């Protein structure tokens, strides 16, 4: 069974966010989130990522019944990840040390597989 552990991407990060923008470039993956309580924008940069998937909010209800630990904010690291298992099954060169980061909001869910923690910084509107 997948288990969701709360992840804090930044010491000042608020738990409830909305994903504003997703940009993938050769320099990596950038996810821009807006905090509900403060309206601040937090940029989350994955300099290297192996894979990511984006799902709509209808996924959350079904996933919550099959997992442990959801409902404690927007940011998680997933243990016993089915996404990692699927990635290894379909990949020609399985990698070591891959972690599954998940950002879950009211309208969008992002799952990112990466070997390093992302960089984060607050940005101006």
Language model regions located:
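Surface-exposed, interaction-prone regions used to assemble/regulate multi-protein complexes
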Residues: 1-125
